[in-house]
Amino acid sequence: MGTVWHAWDPSLQRDVAIKEVLLPAGMSPKERAEARARTLREAKATARISDTAVVTVHDVLEHDDSPWIVMELLRGTSLQHHLDRNGPMPVERVEEAAKALLGGLRAAHAAGVTHRDVKPANIMLTDDDRTVLTDFGI
């Protein structure tokens, strides 16, 4: 759960995506601390994955008591949005996407990371024809 922002990294002179992880209201201080720690731990684990089919995590930090994740900016649309707008994809494109996703999941598992929320909304179809897993359940 969270909001993703398009931002500029002045240090590295590049566009990035920044995700503010929104913690549910009404959590006790202990629950908030545990959720923040889990988010930071999961973001660090995701950053270990190196594969073109997995979004690259550049940094993770805390600001105003909320975790923030700095990631590669992906230009394109989610698979969910694409399907809602265009209907089913051609079989050849589905095969390409499936192969990419399996490669990304293989790389994640090799890094000891399990994607806990694979669904069309968490798969990006980029403008440069990549299929990319995002949001590892963080």
Where are these regions (language model features)?
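Conserved N-lobe ATP-binding subsite of Hanks-type protein kinase domains
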Residues: 3
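Conserved N-lobe loop of protein kinases adjacent to the ATP-binding glycine-rich P-loop
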Residues: 8-16
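AlphaC helix of the eukaryotic protein kinase fold
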Residues: 22-48
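Activation-segment/catalytic-loop signature of the eukaryotic protein kinase fold
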Residues: 60
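Conserved short submotifs of the Hanks-type protein kinase catalytic core
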Residues: 64-78, 82
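Activation segment signature within eukaryotic-like protein kinase domains
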Residues: 97-98
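Protein kinase catalytic-loop region centered on the HRD/HxD motif
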Residues: 101-113
